[in-house]
From Swiss-Prot:
Modified positions (Phosphoserine) in chain numbering: 16
Family from the record: Belongs to the GeBP family.
Biased composition (Acidic residues): 15-38, 50-62
Pfam families: GeBP-like_DBD
Region called Disordered, residue ranges: 1-71
Keywords, comma-separated and alphabetical: Phosphoprotein, Transcription, Transcription regulation
InterPro entries hit by this protein: GEBP, GeBP-like_DBD
GO BP term, example: regulation of DNA-templated transcription
Name the UniProt record assigns to this protein: Probable transcription factor At3g04930
């Protein structure tokens, strides 16, 4: 029994592996594990993942002095073959460049997948910026066709509302009217600004014409714009919200001299004494001769009135009623709907101005005669009291001539004084009748204006 038990124990010891001989017993390691551990180029599958991530040179800073000064390129990614199965330690693919030790060539790692952040920055730099919406504001809003349509609509609006009331028309109704005709998106301020610019453009052309310069239109559109603008702003009256005080008034531009050729593209100014054909306020064409000195400068209303008065013939008492009748016939010819203000003003100027002038001349001569400054008589007699002053052209309120015949204080002088007195009475009666006609015409016109409907 003892021998059999001993033999069994001995056989068991022979079959069990000896731990000193490298066998695996009770959780010991085999020779294969030791060989794999001694190999530096092989990664054990049982190693800690955190240690593998710390040893991964891809996570290190490439610009650090510790890595840039290494003579040997460390392995970025390695593949270990354990039990015939490849295992990758890095999830990101990369290109590994290895150089021998002691090489001074700089090392660069080129990643296969580029950084998306760098990709986005490159797109922002090289992408063409979009067109800014603010630049579209400076694009032209009104085309040539729109300008013509706008001026025509404004001309119709002014023609319809001119003379309908004492107040000037407003631009608000016109904005509502023209907005439906134009295929544009504009507001009232843009409309008023466009009309103001067109008016200023027209005034600039008229100022060049008044200064004697030749005006050439660049295109047929400019010519058409000027012709329509002349029909609009060549009339009196202003528009609410459309006043422009920086330009000349109608009176300064209505009498501008302009002679046009067939296509109205050139305005020439004659050099001396041009004969102008103008439309007066009552619609009657008149020919007026003006000196060249008044052509080269702008004229105010008083200047124009003075030129017209100087160029008119002297109206004698005999032709006064005839002139008044002519004016009345002209007013009847053009109709009551015309502008009667100019007719009344012209009638008063034709009738009253000579009366005032004659009275002023007569008063001056009487004052000079009273002061002893009259001219001596033709027959001698230096201070003979019968001298006639500077009012000799006007016999009103003047003393009779002393021709030197007879003796002062004789009967001939008394007869001459009586004849002059009768002549003065006749002249004053003529002027009185003329003034009565003017007053009657003014009353008639006033009654017609009061009874006239406002829509005409």
């Amino acid at each position: 029994m003892t021998s059999d038990h001993r033999d069994a124990l001995f056989s068991l010891e022979l079959e069990s592996p000896d731990p000193d001989e490298g066998g695996v017993a009770d959780g010991g390691e085999s020779d294969t594990d030791e060989d794999l551990r001694d190999n530096d180029d092989v990664v054990m599958p049982g190693t800690n993942e955190a240690e593998a991530e710390d040893d991964d040179p891809e996570e290190e800073d490439l610009n650090s002095p510790s890595t840039s000064s290494l003579p040997m390129v460390s392995t970025i990614s390695a593949t270990a073959v354990v039990s015939g199965t490849p295992t990758a330690t890095s999830s990101t693919g990369a290109v590994t460049v290895a150089l021998p030790a002691g090489s001074a060539v700089p090392v660069s790692v080129i990643p296969v997948d580029s950084d998306p952040k760098w990709h986005r920055m490159t797109e922002i730099v090289h992408q063409r910026p979009p067109i800014d919406d603010s630049r579209r504001l400076f694009q032209r809003l009104w085309t040539d066709e729109d300008e013509i349509e706008l001026l025509r609509g404004f001309l119709d609006y002014m023609t319809m509302h001119r003379g309908s009331s004492s107040h000037p028309p407003d631009t608000a109704p016109f904005y509502e009217q023209i907005k439906s005709k134009l295929q544009l998106d504009f507001n009232k301020n843009q409309l008023v600004e466009k009309l103001r610019r067109l008016k200023k453009k027209y005034r600039n052309v008229m100022s060049k014409i008044s200064s004697g310069k030749e005006v050439f239109f660049k295109s047929p559109h400019d010519q058409s714009t000027f012709e329509i603008s002349r029909k609009i702003w060549n009339q009196t009256g202003k528009i609410i919200g459309f006043e422009d005080n920086n330009v000349m008034d109608f009176e300064e531009t209505n009498n501008h001299h302009n002679t046009t050729n067939g296509n109205y593209s050139t305005f020439n100014s004659p050099s001396s004494n041009p004969t102008l054909e103008l439309d007066s306020e009552n619609g009657i064409e008149k020919k007026l001769t003006m000196s060249s000195s008044s052509v080269s400068r702008k004229r105010s209303r008083s200047r124009i009135g003075k030129i017209e008065e100087d160029n008119k013939p002297v109206i004698t008492p005999s032709d006064g009623p005839i002139a008044s009748n002519v004016n009345l016939n002209e007013a009847a010819a053009v109709g009551i709907g015309g502008n009667l203000g100019g007719l009344i003003e012209e009638t008063v100027k034709n009738c009253v101005s000579p009366v005032i002038k004659e009275m002023m001349n007569g008063t001056t001569s009487m004052m000079m005669a009273a002061m002893g400054g009259g001219f001596p008589g033709l027959g001698g007699g230096g201070g003979g009291g019968g001298g006639h002053g500077f009012g000799s052209l006007s016999p009103m309120f003047t003393r009779p001539f002393n021709f030197g015949f007879g003796v002062e204080g004789g009967g001939n002088k008394a007869v001459a004084d009586e004849r002059w007195r009768k002549q003065q009475i006749l002249e004053l009666e003529v002027y009185s009748r003329r003034l009565e006609l003017v007053q009657e015409q003014i009353r008639t016109t006033l009654n017609e204006l009061k009874t006239m409907p406002s829509g005409i």
